[in-house]
Swiss-Prot record:
This is C4-dicarboxylate transport protein. It comes from Geobacter sp. (strain M21). GO terms for biological process: L-aspartate transmembrane transport. It holds the Pfam family SDF. The keyword RNA-binding does not apply. GO terms for molecular function: fumarate transmembrane transporter activity; malate:proton symporter activity; succinate transmembrane transporter activity. Belongs to the dicarboxylate/amino acid:cation symporter (DAACS) (TC 2.A.23) family. The gene is dctA. The chain crosses the membrane at residues 9-29, 45-65, 80-100, 150-170, 186-206, 221-241, 291-311, 334-354, 357-377. The keyword Cell inner membrane applies. Coiled coil: none annotated.
């Protein structure tokens, strides 16, 4: 296989684009702000292809299973893992923010805060986040509506039903199975084309962020940001690193393997932007297609570790900054509410702040107006959230695959140790043939 030069690799191109975006936004803020359509356009192209890929991957994965009980088993194990690890993330954020206490001494007066920028978030949060609303929201009004609006959980729900129905058809369902499998190849080919524009999207998104908010806004609440970034690093390398070690892989090698996806997320602040490539990478790593198809899409609502850390830290920070005392009962109440509201967040920019607003609305102890304190820097913390979310969902997929004995451990070792050509993480990875499955 011909070795690419360093400047031909996607990770180098994206990293360079991010650097130019930061420079443009800093020195020419108005021009940088005008670059926003570039980032928005790239994310829209990715979102355009996400739901068809999820549908095809989940349908072929389920229809290819010989044992239909496996679907429920994989889903159950995934949800068990999601709940345990995301709750651990909430707890870690709670412990760190109470140890460092970055909000103590700010003495912010909520009556004097500018809350105009909160209107959009509080209005969205007010639409309802009850458990019943969440469950009903998973069921689409129509299949076309779910695809048109890009509702991942709704598409996942329909794909599971369709896959089960296709499997029940037996031999009669094989032609449809093969057709959907070929369509999936075509969609991944589209992703391969879209990823050529990743550097442009990362450049536009970063130029806009720096141009609009400025590097100066990073220093005003730097202690909170520093605490959050530190907690995310500890979570990834200590918690996920330990989980990875128990499953037979090194977290540093895993992160190196998905470096291109991480850089795309860094540039766009949305873990969804790397979803198609992440699914292909995990299949290439040795995880079965059926497990990848179920775990990754579900994880984008149930396993957002970075968002979980952010939610507890931001909530307690606002309480500290506004001199709102929290006793043990109130703190545990916040943790309990966040265990529910955090499951409704999506892996898109700004969703964490909407979830936080919904949580504050459910907990009258903390003033909603206090959110104005962190509105200005929320955009800068979204990168760490998205990166942690991506790594967390990747690790979750490997773990569930290992639990199900659906992980090719030997291949994973070869890929992570760069003993296979595919481990280079090149763009043509998305065009590879999937593992063989029986229809």
């Amino acid at each position: 296989m011909k070795t690419k030069k360093f400047y031909q690799h996607l990770y180098f191109q994206v990293l360079t684009a991010i650097s130019f975006g930061v420079a443009l936004g800093y020195y020419l803020p108005d021009t940088g702000t005008a670059m926003k359509p570039l980032g928005d356009g790239f994310i829209k192209m990715i979102k355009m292809i996400i739901t068809p890929i999820i549908f095809c991957t989940v349908v072929t994965g389920i229809a290819g299973m010989d044992d239909m009980k496996k679907v429920g088993r994989v889903g159950g194990k995934a949800l068990l893992y999601f709940e345990a690890v995301s709750t651990l993330a909430l707890g870690i954020g709670l412990v760190v923010i109470n140890i460092i206490q970055p909000g103590v001494g700010m003495n912010a007066d909520v009556t004097k805060l500018d809350t105009k920028g909160l209107d959009t978030y509080t209005a969205t949060a007010a639409k309802g986040h009850s458990f019943v609303d969440f469950v009903l929201g998973v069921i689409p009004n129509s299949v076309v509506d779910a695809f048109a609006k890009g509702e991942i959980l709704q598409v996942l729900f329909f794909a599971i039903l369709f896959g089960l129905a296709l499997s029940a058809m037996g031999e009669k369902g094989k032609p449809v199975y093969r057709l959907i499998d070929e369509v999936a190849h075509a969609f991944f080919g589209v992703v391969n084309i879209i990823m050529k524009f990743a550097p442009i999207g990362a450049f536009g998104a970063m130029a806009f962020t720096i141009g609009k908010f400025g590097l100066g806004s990073l220093t005003k609440l730097g202690m909170l940001m520093g605490s959050f970034y530190l907690t995310c690093l500890l979570f990834v390398f200590v918690v996920l690193g330990t989980i990875g070690k128990l499953c037979g892989f090194n977290i540093f090698k895993f992160i190196s393997y998905i470096k291109e996806e991480l850089l795309i997320v860094l540039g766009t602040s949305s873990s969804e932007s790397a979803l198609p490539r992440m699914m292909a990478k995990l299949e290439n790593l040795g995880c079965s297609k059926s497990v990848v198809g179920l775990v990754i899409p579900t994880g984008y609502s149930f396993n957002l570790d970075g968002t979980s850390i952010y939610l507890t830290m931001a909530a307690v920070f606002v309480a500290q900054a506004t001199n709102t005392p929290l006793d043990l009962t109130q703190t545990l109440t916040i943790l309990g509410v966040l265990m529910l509201t955090s499951k409704g967040a999506a892996g898109v920019t700004g969703s964490g702040f909407v979830t936080l607003a919904a949580t504050f609305a459910a907990i009258p102890t903390i003033p909603v107006a206090g959110l104005a304190l962190i509105l200005g820097i929320d955009r800068f913390m979204s990168e760490a959230r998205a990166l942690t979310n991506l790594v967390g969902n990747g690790v979750a997929t490997v773990v569930v695959s290992r639990w199900e004995n659906e992980l090719d451990v030997a291949r994973m070792s070869q890929v992570l140790n760069k003993e296979l050509d595919e481990a280079d993480g090149e763009a043509d990875l998305l065009m590879m043939d999937p593992e063989p499955e029986e229809a």
